Amino acid sequence: MKFDPPLETVTLLRRYKRFMADVVRADGSEITVHCPNTGSMKNCVLGGPQQALISDSGNPKRKYRHTLEALQVAHGHWAGVNTARPNALVEEAVRAGQFPMLDSTSGVEREVKYGDSRFDLALGERADPHTFIEVKNVTLGPGPDDKDDGVIAFPDSVTERGQKHLQTLMDVVASGKRAVLFFCVQHSGATAARPADEIDARYGQLLREAIENGVEVLAWKSEVSAQCFRLKEPLPLDL
């Protein structure tokens, strides 16, 4: 996923009302941008001015023309905070054949229903996929006062929706189909991924149960820069 022109570097002043953020541009002007992230953004928004990257939709009629894409977080790392990006990154990589274990030759579909749930991606025919993929944006890294250990966690707040997805992924496996949970780790300091048991113990419990029941879990680190976002290397899962 290349950005041409590159993302604009600004200074984040504040995030508020969940979906809004105020930033200052290089010329000193202040604008409000869209913040597409429903999580707490713990250890991403640090509480004071910090470097950020924004994209421009090019649409002057949009209420908030610009979108918050990434933040410089503790220890000088960057985290991608636009939760719409991981789905596109994973789909792009699957279609490009980056993951031999996720063969796209039979087709790649978006937003596919299974029961009363909807998964981000599926492989095979839309009416009868053989593989369901749920993608998660993983950004919870160490804070400013924490050791920079490179272990990035999910979720950053209690997620009943995420818990439901894990239960449905287990149902998928029980039905004879393949289920994959893909942790897209948008954090430049990442060396491993883990469940954030201290935030959502139930999610961690269900994740381990899902793995025991045949759900496949992949974790990949994404490059986060003004020029491009791309999945670059697999990460170990610290359970």
Curated annotation (Swiss-Prot):
Record-linked Pfam families: SfsA, SfsA_N
InterPro entries: SfsA (IPR005224), SfsA_C (IPR040452), SfsA_N (IPR041465)
A molecular function (GO) term: DNA binding
Family matches, as HAMAP family: SfsA
Similarity comment: Belongs to the SfsA family.
Name this protein carries in UniProt: Sugar fermentation stimulation protein homolog
Species: Alcanivorax borkumensis (strain ATCC 700651 / DSM 11573 / NCIMB 13689 / SK2)
